[in-house]
Amino acid sequence: MSGTTFDHLVVAARTLDEGAAWVMSKLGVAPVAGGKHPTMGTHNRLLFIGQRRFLEVIAIDPDAPAPGRPRWFDLDDPGMRTKLEHGPALIHWVERTDDMDAALREYPQPVEVLALARGSYRWRIGVPKDGRRPGGGTLPTLIQWEGSLHPAEALPDTGCRLERFAAKEGRIEAVFSTPSGTRTIP
């Protein structure tokens, strides 16, 4: 897809604590507090993995009311919930665009564009109305950050870098350089 670039990886977990512990066990570094997404009833933790790149650990926020729509990234899907009972997983990736409307003209699946905000961050994100990952996980989610602020710029640099990543048939593999060596998350 033209006009997009990698933005972040998505790790889903039943709880943020489980997700953070999983990332720590895989990469040897821990994500830091992110924030809440009231529209989706989720919250997250974030890990810097390079310039304008981050890894997001996301989970349903037990303190949030149920959203008036299905949550993103399949988090309401019974199959995803069963999968996460066995532990957190790298489930998706998000690509950034500077022109959401142009990117969506090339995008092979209809999505609803949500305008969201948290603190000084503002973004538009394309989410299928059913909350599932686009293309059953074979297409990236599209995001457009409004203004010049990007969450990765505020994250501590732990020395973890995404070296390469591949998505094929809904499966993701990411290779990282970390302070303790090269690590791969399948």
Kindly give the residue locations of the regions a language model identified.
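Vicinal oxygen chelate
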Residues: 35, 43-48, 53-61, 76-79, ...
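Eukaryotic phosphotyrosine signaling hubs
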Residues: 6, 88-91
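Short, composition-biased local secondary-structure segments
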Residues: 13, 73-74
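Glycine-centered loop/turn motif at secondary-structure junctions
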Residues: 27-28, 72, 108
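Long, hydrophobic/aromatic-enriched structural stretches that serve as scaffold segments
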Residues: 60-61, 66-71
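Active-site-proximal cofactor/substrate-binding loop regions of enzyme domains
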Residues: 1-57, 65
